[in-house]
């Protein structure tokens, strides 16, 4: 499917209009005196434009699921409104609406385990399209232990809460809104861009193709501990947009334990997360057997996951997430997860074991308190079953280079510098270097350059 040029006129006009409105709104807001006042309603907005390009890279072969080896460009644009209201009962209701556009490399989301732009799942072509992103209810029951202040943020109204509390979230939201937080690597609009950095690469969390679902999540805050449990809907068919509403049979379950601590006087948090998915998916052993028993006449015949996608499968994963401040201006993070990888990807990306680690430094030390710089490395691997399928010449949903395949872990480095333009806008330059894209030693390395403009108020 072909798209119009990289920077369509409609997107540029929308971005300019949005930034102009943002400047007007910011001027009005900056005149108000600062005070610690609880919010009873909220209206916040963000805009992000991310353009990326890569030069040509080495390739010994390819299929329709391979990243194109020639020089290429891609972009994403998003414009989001976040609105919230506190009810008389103390509950909060939030609604988010988004306008998004974008075109991936190769005009298709293929050819990598760790994709290079976290916004690309929301894009559906060069023409901006609106959609309802979130609609959820949150109730907090305070249980003592002292008070703490929650700052105003997207989908969080400024307020006082008890340190010990129980929180229930229900409706349409993202699993990542509640689970797998990290101060240094969480938001691809402001921090690292690669999928394997802003969450666990192997976390096949239940969601539609845009990354959202319907469900419930409970959180119990107790002293330095937090316990979280949730169940979310997934797609009717793996990696697609329509929702499977049979939440009793097909679902994604998450359980997370978090502990806050101090190390050498600096705060940190350690999280352990387990997930379980149940859905109608293909097993890689069945797909490999089918491929070997039916001589493929074309690359399309090698995508045998579609021929054996029957019967319910259960998928498990376990991960460890660490964030640790080294000083008020510097911190490090690490995520590691292993999933069983016996069945195809349900809703995220094709990674079965992931390791990501890095550091972030604030620019206060050189007189740029609004700036920050980050550096991270990643290591993505496949399960034995998925690897054997690819080695047999199979083509999966996002990856598979056909017969020109020699397995190696997909490894990469990402670094960025985020320049604060004013109180509400940042311009980020980003560099990613990926070895063995889509786990194929016969392709790459791949270098991706990115420029991102983000505004929020």
Go through the PLM ranges and name each one:
Residues 85-87, 97, 139-141, 172, ...:
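Residue-level signature of outer-membrane beta-barrel architecture
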Residues 30-41, 55-56, 84-93, 142-165, ...:
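Short loop/turn motifs that connect adjacent beta-strands in outer-membrane beta-barrel proteins
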Residues 41, 75-81, 131-135, 166, ...:
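Hydrophobic, lipid-facing positions within transmembrane beta-strands of outer-membrane proteins
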Residues 256-258, 273-312, 333, 340, ...:
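Outer membrane beta-barrel transmembrane domains
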Residues 110-127, 131, 146-252, 256, ...:
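Surface-exposed coil loops of outer-membrane beta-barrel proteins
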Residues 133-146, 375, 445-457:
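Outer-membrane beta-barrel "beta-signal"
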Residues 195-322, 327-332, 336-343, 350, ...:
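Signature for the C-terminal beta-barrel architecture of outer-membrane proteins
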Residues 43, 47-51, 95-99, 168-172, ...:
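Transmembrane beta-barrel strands of outer-membrane/channel proteins
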